[in-house]
Amino acid sequence: MNLLPKSSREFGSVDYWEKFFQQRGKKAFEWYGTYLELCGVLHKYIKPREKVLVIGCGNSELSEQLYDVGYRDIVNIDISEVVIKQMKECNATRRPQMSFLKMDMTQMEFPDASFQVVLDKGTLDAVLTDEEEKTLQQVDRMLAEVGRVLQVGGRYLCISLAQAHILKKAVGHFSREGWMVRVHQVANSQDQVLEAEPQFSLPVFAFIMTKFRPVPGSALQIFELCAQEQRKPVRLESAERLAEAVQERQQYAWLCSQLRRKARLGSVSLDLCDGDTGEPRYTLHVVDSPTVKPSRDNHFAIFIIPQGRETEWLFGMDEGRKQLAASAGFRRLITVALHRGQQYESMDHIQAELSARVMELAPAGMPTQQQVPFLSVGGDIGVRTVQHQDCSPLSGDYVIEDVQGDDKRYFRRLIFLSNRNVVQSEARLLKDVSHKAQKKRKKDRKKQRPADAEDLPAAPGQSIDKSYLCCEHHKAMIAGLALLRNPELLLEIPLALLVVGLGGGSLPLFVHDHFPKSCIDAVEIDPSMLEVATQWFGFSQSDRMKVHIADGLDYIASLAGGGEARPCYDVIMFDVDSKDPTLGMSCPPPAFVEQSFLQKVKSILTPEGVFILNLVCRDLGLKDSVLAGLKAVFPLLYVRRIEGEVNEILFCQLHPEQKLATPELLETAQALERTLRKPGRGWDDTYVLSDMLKTVKIV
């Protein structure tokens, strides 16, 4: 039998409630939770000796249960004569001090300041069915009466689903009256499923509006939220922020409900925040593997990503997480990323902190009392040391951090906080610095902290392994030098390069150190990045390495002049990112691949030179357009896709006759590598130039 109204308008009609209680008979209808679910909030805000008015009491057992645990002075009112008669008959003998009155709550007959608490369980929700003028006037009369019959210091305690229009009305009304406003989420309410809505469970909230004595001229407003797991309420700056916080709790309840019902939600992620500061502490991704055959022990697992490794493909990309989940062999895997700026004591502490929350995301059909394993790499939480934080006027907030990789080597990273899952620049640290960091970690095991200035090497440049390229797209770009004529002679002849986009400086620095006759112009629009590269990534200028602080568009345009430019660069490299995340192409900015600008690039490239472009484009239509534009200016175009990333490296040349077949290209790459691998010169043994070019295709 469907006892919840099909239309919200029915909530406000006397006829509906008369019919409702006649159908229900003497069976209690515990709308919005039972006493056991609400008692924590009720006992927190109502004292046993206080005089309590319950408005819209219905046939709920709530008043009876409060009476039985010591709350004697309770008056119940309802608009339904049927229910008042029922409740009087039920309680006349067993609860003689409790009274039931048929009364309209918009026109109550009690004297002013008669009660210390007005308790409302779903009544405001039943009345405020829409925002039409007639409805709002009725609600205004109801809330005005609540304020009239309450004493100063008294509380209006309203149990509600906190729909947006209801929260707005209640908070707005009482905050204008100078009352303190608190919203308290009822513990475990997200597990309650309304009979009429089996597909969704709404969380239940308690509004606690405390009546203050009016202070003429005072504009003080107090808004607080007390989430169920918090020990103390959090003060919020405005009614709007309070509404947002409530909505976040509702959205989380919806998400949990859908995940319990095998709903296909696609990629699901959420942040778990510090209850006191509101700062994100964990980022969770829910990954389902429908192909995994269910068994008792493979329903659900939690994977803790070691600090600093959340940007790796396996943990930071949807496809990588799917691969991780499939290899782990669980129906549902939740990956957990730890945030910089937060302190984590140990894996055990993280597990204890997460256990209750992650169980709300468990899949349907998981056996009760089943142990859920916590997984990780290496068995610890990893190492992340924030070395420096600052803000660039052009790039925004950024952070320099040292992290430990899976081989126990340490890496230094530049990350823009506007896109914190992308490593902007990365360099490997030398082993002596790694050992220092390891000792520091042992010293600070009980409490992690950012490195102090005195902990840093005296000469930051000496801490960087300049022979090692961390970024796969940088390795591919260097391998593209094999397209130049006579690559085995490149160490002996002058080589002019233009690099647009400095970042941490790893790319131009590698060329500078491995090609002793090279002369490099690096163009960087953001002066802060030059400081970062110099202070933290071992970069330095010399007579062969010059940095120009300028917009790459303007710099190349000035060289191209009026179209009569003299070719001056053997190699031009674009490794420049876009600051606009809405474009579908994050590298380079669109202006860098417009045909008019590409003509300028062409004019400063030597006839046998190579133009190398790092392209990061998720919009397939836009990518096709970029490739067509490049092909129109540079007839010979190679593409090398970076596995596991969106990056594609484009090698552009001016003459089709320069084309090299794959065997010839691999042979020249091997010849170049033999030249670079000289005794006494550092070289990463895992870096094989010819491997970088095996998958190159001609467009």
Swiss-Prot record:
This is eEF1A lysine and N-terminal methyltransferase. Its EC number is 2.1.1.-. Changing residue 524 to A: Loss of activity. GO terms for cellular component: cytoplasm; cytosol; mitochondrion; nucleus. Residues 436-448 have a biased composition (Basic residues). InterPro entries: Lys/N-term_MeTrsfase_sf, Methyltransf_25, SAM-dependent_MTases_sf. It is found in: Cytoplasm; Nucleus; Mitochondrion. Its main location: cytoplasm. The modification N-acetylmethionine is found at residue 1. CDD domains: AdoMet_MTases. Changing residue 71 to A: Loss of eEF1A lysine methyltransferase activity. Changing residue 58 to R: Loss of eEF1A lysine methyltransferase activity. GO terms for molecular function: protein-lysine N-methyltransferase activity. The lineage of its organism: Eukaryota, Metazoa, Chordata, Craniata, Vertebrata. Dual methyltransferase that catalyzes methylation of elongation factor 1-alpha (EEF1A1 and EEF1A2) at two different positions, and is therefore involved in the regulation of mRNA translation. Via its C-terminus, methylates EEF1A1 and EEF1A2 at the N-terminal residue 'Gly-2'. Via its N-terminus dimethylates EEF1A1 and EEF1A2 at residue 'Lys-55'. Has no activity towards core histones H2A, H2B, H3 and H4. It comes from Homo sapiens (Human). The modification Phosphoserine is found at residue 267. Keywords: Acetylation, Cytoplasm, Methyltransferase, Mitochondrion, Multifunctional enzyme, Nucleus, Phosphoprotein, Transferase. Belongs to the methyltransferase superfamily. It is linked to METTL13 unregulation may be involved in tumorigenesis. High METTL13 expression has been observed in pancreatic and lung cancer tissues, correlates with overexpression of dimethylated elongation factor 1-alpha and is associated with poor clinical outcome. The disease mechanism involves dysregulation of mRNA translation and enhanced protein synthesis to sustain growth of malignant cells.
